[in-house]
Design a protein with these regions (language model features):
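Non-heme Fe(II)-dependent double-stranded beta-helix
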Residues: 2-24, 31-132
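Secondary-structure boundary elements
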Residues: 89-98, 131-135, 144-152, 164
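A short secondary-structure junction signal
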Residues: 115-118, 123, 151-160, 166-170, ...
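Short, conserved beta-strand element in jelly-roll/cupin
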Residues: 130-150, 208-211, 245-248
């Protein structure tokens, strides 16, 4: 697993090691969040869902990321989300958290149907934190149900880029109108933007993640993913990833909680953000979505813990137990 993996006790005990990695590089790989057997069970459930599609209806989407079909509410997605909670609980030092209802990533091997491989010198680098958010706002995460080596479908980052977040958005080249259009969404970098980061010492690095591991990153980190490389050793390796983000529940405002309840009750997807600046995902695929989506929440999503994470049930912030950091994220007006 190399230098990018923190010892497996990190989930419970090594918070300092996780935070050091996040501060130094902007990301951290944590192994053994799930066991191999757990991963195989969840993969099996996703394969059962995939089997409901016809040959020409497969839900594989651009960059392997699926944010439709209510996938954020599928049983295995909620099960993985609950398993990943311990990581965020370690980071935030509280179990009073809210979760995004985020997407998943599934991709079949490109060797299977002569599909596209990675093209050198291409990228879709982006920031998931807009200029409206000042400074640090949270950590994103992705749980890997299958191993991803550097030549597989692999997460890629500009190392250290969170430290340049304010400087990047303060440039004259970034127009205020462009910032406004991305108040809650992400910013797609141009070639000139990427060159600017390179000039400031931030270079691309692929980040391998072991099966059952999780990569956590500062939301100010510039990142994308790369398609598998042609001639890779593991020609039959799929991609199965579940995206999870959790932040302290005490940060949420009334309007945020209203949107979270709507997402839960209507089985809607949300953006990456769990506590502030919630955005609901709109339907994208009309008839296909209706045919292959679930119509009611699975049992695991109706548990007390899941309802707390979804913002449907309320935490007791006066019970004497830790509520998380005593500061709140800052916002700007453009």
């Amino acid at each position: 697993m190399g230098d990018d993996a923190v010892n497996s006790t990190a989930v419970q005990f090594n918070r300092d090691a996780i935070l050091k990695e996040l501060n130094d590089k902007g990301y951290c790989v944590i192994p053994d969040v799930l066991t191999s057997d757990e991963c195989d069970v969840y993969i099996g459930k996703y394969r059962d869902w995939l089997a409901t599609f016809g040959e020409d209806e497969a839900p594989f989407q651009r960059h392997s990321i699926i944010q439709s079909y209510r996938v954020g509410h599928l049983e295995p997605t909620w099960e993985v989300r609950l398993k990943a909670k311990s990581v965020f609980q370690t980071i935030w030092q509280t179990d009073k958290l809210l979760s995004s209802v985020d997407g998943i990533a599934i991709a079949e091997p490109p060797e299977k149907k002569s599909q596209e491989f990675h093209t050198p010198n291409t990228n879709w680098f982006h920031l998931d934190q807009s200029a409206m958010r000042v400074g640090f706002h949270g950590y994103q995460g992705a749980v890997y149900l299958e191993e991803a080596s550097e030549n597989d479908y692999c997460f890629r980052v500009l190392v250290g880029s969170p430290k340049l977040y304010e400087s990047f958005y303060d440039r004259d080249e970034i127009e205020a109108e462009a910032k406004k259009s991305n108040e809650l969404g992400h910013y797609m970098l141009s070639n000139n933007d990427v060159a600017w980061y390179h000039q400031h010492g931030c270079y691309p690095r692929k980040v391998p993640v072991p099966k059952g591991g999780m990569v956590v990153w500062d939301a100010r980190l510039v990142h994308d993913n790369c398609r598998p490389e042609e001639g890779r050793p593991n020609k039959d390796r799929w991609r199965f990833v579940v995206f999870v983000c959790m932040t302290p529940a005490r940060w949420a405002r009334k309007k945020d909680l209203q949107l979270k309840r709507e997402a839960y009750e209507k089985l809607m997807m949300t953006s990456h953000w769990p506590s502030q600046g919630i955005a609901l995902k709109k339907k994208r695929l009309a008839h296909l979505e209706e045919e292959h989506r679930i119509e009611k929440l699975p049992g695991v999503a109706r548990s007390h813990e899941a309802k707390l994470l979804a913002g449907v049930e309320e935490y007791d912030f006066e019970d004497g137990r830790p509520n998380g950091p005593d500061w709140e994220p800052q916002w700007s007006e453009l």
